[in-house]
C-alpha cells in the first residue's frame, strides 16, 4: 500500500521526488479501540512540494485501499479530535501565517470525518500544551506535514478533492 501511494504521488507531482520520499515517510495499519485496523498515513514538511491538491492524494488512495482491503475507518477519540484542533491552531498561529485561518470547529470536523488517519512526524520545536501523551499520536511536538495536509489540502481543496474521490 505504501509503495503504491508513493508511486502515485510521484506521478501526480510529475517527478517532484521530495514530496513522496521525504514528505510521506510511511504508511501503516494501526488498531482502533474496537480491534479493527485503519490506514495511518504519516506526513512531514516536504509534502508542501507536492502542492495542496496533490498532498491530499495519499488520503484518497489510502481510503480506496482501506475499502479494497476491508479495513475499518479511523475512529478518533474525543481527545485526539481536540489534539488535532489545538495542534493545527498552534501551527497556523505560531509557525505559518495565512490570510485564511481555519476555525477550531472546522478543524474538529475534519479530524472527526476523515476515514484515514492524517498523522505525521514532528517537524517543529513547538509542543502542544493541553492534549499531550496520547497513545496513537507519537509526539507532543507540532507535526507540520499533518497540519499542511489538513489546512492547505483538505481545508482549501475540499471540493476538488471530493470530485477526485468520486471518480
Each PLM stretch: what is its role?
Residues 1-167:
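Extended, Lys/Arg-rich, non-catalytic nucleic-acid recognition/anchoring regions
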Amino acid at each position: 500500500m505504501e509503495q503504491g501511494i508513493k508511486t502515485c504521488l510521484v506521478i501526480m507531482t510529475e517527478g517532484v521526488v521530495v514530496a513522496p520520499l521525504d514528505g510521506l515517510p510511511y504508511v501503516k495499519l494501526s488498531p482502533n479501540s474496537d480491534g479493527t485496523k485503519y490506514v495511518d498515513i504519516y506526513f512531514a514538511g516536504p509534502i508542501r512540494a507536492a502542492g495542496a491538491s496533490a498532498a491530499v492524494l495519499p488520503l484518497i488512495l489510502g481510503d480506496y485501499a482501506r475499502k479494497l482491503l476491508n479495513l475499518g475507518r479511523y475512529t478518533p477519540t474525543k481527545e485526539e479530535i481536540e489534539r488535532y484542533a489545538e495542534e493545527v491552531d498552534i501551527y497556523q498561529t505560531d509557525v505559518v501565517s495565512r490570510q485564511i485561518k481555519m476555525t477550531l470547529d472546522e478543524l474538529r470536523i475534519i479530524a472527526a470525518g476523515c476515514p484515514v488517519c492524517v498523522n505525521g512526524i514532528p517537524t517543529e520545536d513547538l509542543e502542544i500544551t493541553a492534549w499531550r501523551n496520547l497513545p496513537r499520536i507519537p509526539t507532543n511536538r507540532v507535526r507540520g506535514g499533518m497540519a499542511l495536509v489538513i489546512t492547505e489540502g483538505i481545508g482549501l481543496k475540499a471540493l476538488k478533492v471530493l470530485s477526485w474521490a468520486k471518480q
